[in-house]
Amino acid sequence: DSQPRDAVQKIGKGLAIGSVILLVAAVGAVALNSYFEEQEKGQSQSGEEYDEYQFAKRQLSETGEAYDEVLTGGYYEVGVHIPEGIYTVEAQDGESAIYLIDDENGIYIWQQIGNDPENPNQAAVMDDLRLYDGALLEVKSGAALQFRSDCAQTERLHGETNPLQDSVRVEVGQTMTAGRDFPEGLYNVKSEPDWNDLMMTLPDSFLSEFAADEERRVEVISFAPKELDLSYENVPIPKGTEIQTTGAAVTLEPSEKIGSTDYGEFYKE
């Protein structure tokens, strides 16, 4: 099985989640945006058009099944949570963004999607989004995004049913530790309707080599009091992670499908 990868930390590798996890830090978004702006600027000055897929090891099939699904904020492993294929992506209402991390094929994409005419970096519709099996797709909180494909490889979907069955509630002011107070694993994080941050303090084994000795890595998922912004899907919570919530109670609901359970790959630099 392919390993999930952390979109935020990939920013530091020349891509730009500078993570869910992020979960993905705001500075990551800025760094990633700046990276791609520089790439596009360099290409335009040389008269060339930047090709995000120039290092892909194979071509995606142009035949397959029709796929039409709405995805909200969260992490989606291609081949597990969404089939491989060539997609058109459109915001239903409002604006959002996607991060695509595909180390196998050298594909790193960050794109804002919405209908703000004053935002030159925002696409109303994103065509030709190529999702290869094993890549990690992150959909940011905001508008729900419609993913459509005429060549989705639905018959190749894999992964296993999540063995976890019980939900976990975390109250404001409470600290809970994965592996002690609840099982580590892959969860959908649901917040009560309020402005809220879920703070995830990762164990020492996930420290950056550049971090000071006393620092521990904290990932943040932010929620807004809007229906579409109250859930983040498929969040890996490794053993030893401390969970706190700042503005409202959250519920950790086991994700339906899981891929790899080696979350070191997800949070790696």
Give the ranges of each region predicted by the language model.
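Surface-exposed interaction/gating patches
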Residues: 176-198
